[in-house]
Amino acid sequence: MSKIMNDIIQSLFPGNCFEELLINFNFFHPTCPKAVLSRGLGFAITLGSILLFVPQILKIQAARSAQGISAASQLLALVGAIGTASYSYRSGFVFSGWGDSFFVAVQLVIIILQIFLFSGQTMLSVGFLGIVSAVAYGVVSKSIPMQTLTAVQTAGIPIVVVSKLLQISQNYRAQSTGQLSLISVFLQFAGTLARVFTSVQDTGDMLLIVSYSTAAVLNGLIFAQFFMYWSHSESAAKKKRN
């Protein structure tokens, strides 16, 4: 039990920060306050990400439809999330720095399965699940080399851009955000903004910093579209009810 508590303390208070801040009350330490804030933010983002897409999943399930949600956008977002989680896991970064990517990937898998199933593509959903399982095994067993994961993470930046632009474009053409969940999109936007700070503080890895910065800007645009097309989405919903 004491080992578990020690691991938790070390996760939140790197180095000698526990002693500096909570024993010596050295709140003006040059690095510890920022380091602990970053770790705390990281854990908060990771915990929040467990439910990030639950509103979206429930909305699709209730409507029995994924209308307005770009399958290509979700697939590319999944590649980006898996790339970040796999690269960070194999690089040995603390879980609080990438755990959200893992949980986001799991939820994106569910959303993509919903898109396939509600469009009658059952066999496609089975094949998709098989591919995801094989990739997960390859990462954990180290069958996939680190060079490949680095390449995927590097490619993740344009992948994120294309993924978000596809959804932005679909919203623009429809003048509506369809079945997109406002709560999920807002949490994505806030989470990627916070991740820019935690990536700078915890890893200093430019691949992650640029990736999260790009995602934050594009998530902000999608969030703004809810307010731009609010009246269109409301009128479309009323027509469907009538």
UniProtKB/Swiss-Prot annotation:
Domain PQ-loop: start-end pairs: 37-95, 152-202
Manganese listed as a keyword: no
Cellular localization per UniProt: Membrane
Family membership noted in the UniProt record: Belongs to the MPDU1 (TC 2.A.43.3) family.
Biological processes per GO annotation: IRE1-mediated unfolded protein response; oligosaccharide biosynthetic process
An annotated GO cellular component: membrane
Coiled coil (residue ranges): none
Transmembrane segments: 40-60, 68-88, 98-118, 120-140, 148-168, 180-200, 207-227
Species: Caenorhabditis elegans
Name of the protein: Mannose-P-dolichol utilization defect 1 protein homolog
Alphabetical list of SMART domains matching this protein: CTNS (SM00679)
Alphabetical list of PANTHER family matching this protein: MANNOSE-P-DOLICHOL UTILIZATION DEFECT 1 LEC35 -RELATED, MANNOSE-P-DOLICHOL UTILIZATION DEFECT 1 PROTEIN
Cross-referenced Gene3D superfamilies: 1.20.1280.290
One Pfam family from the record: PQ-loop
Bilayer topology: Multi-pass membrane protein
Keywords: Membrane, Repeat, Transmembrane, Transmembrane helix, Transport
